[in-house]
Amino acid sequence: MHRIDTSTAQVDKFGAGKNGFTGGNPQTGELPTALDADFFDSVQEEISSVIESSGVALDKSKKNQLVTAIKALVSSGRLLNKKIFSSSGIYSPTTGTKLIIVEAIGGGGAGGGSVATTSGQQSSGSGGASGGYVMATFTSGFAGASYIIGSGGSAANGNNGGNGSSTTFLTINAGGGSGGPVGTASAASVIAGSFGGSATGGDINAAGSNGNSGIVYTASVALGGFGGSSKIYPGNGGASRASTGDGFPATGYGCGGGGGNSGASGGARAGGIGAQGLIIIWEYS
């Protein structure tokens, strides 16, 4: 686009190099500003390009197309809202939502328990694994979609930790983490940790973190395995237990519980429970 540059333009009306228009002055002989096709073409194409770039077709009968186009161009892609879901339900998007980015975490597995011991023995369960993590973008079909939040694994004295369950939304599935295996009674043993939850259907699919091994070092030193951390809650798996007791529960969504620990001549213990999953939805215009 350009400012008026015909021979009768009012030179530097708005500052140096910023010509303007004049209606002329018969008393002084000043002519009114003449308009040429070049100027009108410039104005027409400048305005038309804004309207058409918004996807709106030019319509001679409408007088509001420029403001309609500006609103569409300025508002498109704007973050409208962030919603966090910790219980299953049906998704209702904010008015004006055209695109969503969904983050989902599966439920964490519970830590493995520990069995009863005799003198000279210890027992340490391994940590539960965290749920998988999925991120996906959707531009249609999301309004009214049902979703499921995965539950955390349960725990019981002297038993393997329970598995976490899957968190799902449309095509994505963030699998639950596996429960940790129960410890054995011995003077030295290693109980390998469980595997992280699977992740499918997203633009980003990341398996959960494995639970840590439960280890009996000697007849007097043992550690229950710590739980796996989820991708958005690092460090929130159930802590490792060095003393006799039930495993520590997970403290962040999708994380695994810690393993239980039984000292010498101790009773059976449970692992720590796994944490439930989560869905986060980012809504854009």
Tell what function each PLM region has.
Residues 1-74:
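Extracellular "spike/adhesin" assembly and maturation modules
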Residues 9-14, 40, 69-75, 97-99, ...:
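Surface-exposed, low-hydrophobicity beta-strand/loop segments enriched in small/polar/acidic residues
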Residues 43-46, 50, 248-262:
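Right-handed beta-helix
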Residues 48-56, 106-111, 150-156, 173-181, ...:
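Acidic glycine-/aspartate-rich tracts in secreted/extracellular proteins
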Residues 49-88, 176, 181-190, 194-198, ...:
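Glycine-rich, low-complexity segments
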Residues 64-65, 168-172:
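Terminal edge beta-strands and adjacent linker/stalk segments
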Residues 84-86, 90, 94, 104-170, ...:
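Glycine-rich strand-loop-strand elements at beta-sheet edges
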Residues 173-248:
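Acidic, glycine-rich loop-and-strand cores that form catalytic or ligand-binding grooves
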